[in-house]
């Protein structure tokens, strides 16, 4: 996962005009990277995070369709907040990515150092996809990620 992130960081020249092909390319690269990171963290630390425990509790309290809409909404709102509003408040790329990924991680209530590292990593990749494509790219990645986690763990 570190190699994947470093490669993405090396590719950090921002695209000015983003087409659907580029968006899908970066969404795919980001998704595979997130999958590798999550699998590695799962092998190291099998216990779920506080965020996962909260989501499991919520999932059992509401109909599945409502929970699915919640995940979709969370993906869109989080990306708009972190990688549009906050993103545009800061000019320097390194600070943009660091600020948004740290705040993203904090919002997901990491209860352990490993959970913290996982959410920071997720935030880093969402930030790099945002930079290499656009807000729709990071929203798409976040949405695909949340839906994949839902299908794999909650159904």
For the regions a language model picked out, list residue spans one by one:
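Transmembrane helix-loop-helix hairpins at the membrane interface
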Residues: 64-155
């Amino acid at each position: 996962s570190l190699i994947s992130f470093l490669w993405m960081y090396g590719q950090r020249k921002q695209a000015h005009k983003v087409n659907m092909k580029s968006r899908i390319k970066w969404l795919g690269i980001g998704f595979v990277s997130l999958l590798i990171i999550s699998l590695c963290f799962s092998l190291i630390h099998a216990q779920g995070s506080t965020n996962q425990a909260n989501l499991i509790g919520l999932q059992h309290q509401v109909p599945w369709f409502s929970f699915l809409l919640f995940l979709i909404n969370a993906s869109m709102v989080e990306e708009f907040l972190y990688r549009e509003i906050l993103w545009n408040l800061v000019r320097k790329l390194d600070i943009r990515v660091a600020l948004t990924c740290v705040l993203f991680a904090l919002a997901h209530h990491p209860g352990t150092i490993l959970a913290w590292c996982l959410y920071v990593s997720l935030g880093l990749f969402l930030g790099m996809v945002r930079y290499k494509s656009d807000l729709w790219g990071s929203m798409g990645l976040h949405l695909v990620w949340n839906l994949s986690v839902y299908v794999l763990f909650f159904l």
